[in-house]
Amino acid sequence: MGEIMYQRILVAVDGSETSLLALDHAVGLAKAFGSELTLLSVIDQLKLPFSAEYGLGARESHEDLMRNVIEDLNEVTMNLRETHPGLSFDARVEEGRPAKIIVEVAEVFDLIVIGSQGFGLIAGWFLGSVSNEVVNSCTKPLLIVKKPGDQKPDPSP
């Protein structure tokens, strides 16, 4: 029974408020269980800027996006090192559809922590579309973190 419940925790980080809340929860769990923590940022290929809109070629746009994601993740990891010395964690960046990449990477983890934007019924049944797709595709235990105050509307009149 002395086995760590969650030896490896994966947290998806995209810089949004809910992903940073998810990171806070993941850090708390990693500290409580003595777990290894991995931060994952996914470059969504569908969000690559169109060259005509920005006056950049596709290659420059991709490189700029990649650089921005890496800089944001580096800032998060530097903050973690300062605020949680001794915390065992690593960070990685992948490219693709965020939900698909999260589910693929999740296979070697014991718990997945992800923030949900909570866009409402149409966008994702009260979860954001990425978290909704992860919930429906992932076979690993999940912790979905929502912003305080995000809740289903009361269906009563």
Where are the language model's segments positioned?
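Structural beta-alpha unit
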Residues: M1-M5, M78-I112, G149-P157
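Short, solvent-exposed amphipathic alpha-helices that sit
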Residues: H25, D64-V76, I101
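Small/aliphatic-rich secondary-structure junction motif
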Residues: G2-L56, S137
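Gly/Ser-rich helix-loop-strand patches that form or flank binding pockets
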Residues: F109-P153
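Short, well-ordered secondary-structure micro-motifs
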Residues: A22, P49-A52, I101-E104, W125, ...
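General small-molecule cofactor/ligand-binding pocket signal
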Residues: T38-L40, D90-E94, L143
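Acidic, proline/glycine-rich short linear motifs
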Residues: V42-E71, Q151-P157
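Conserved N-terminal glycine/acidic-rich loop preference
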Residues: L39, M66-L73, F109-L111, G115-G118
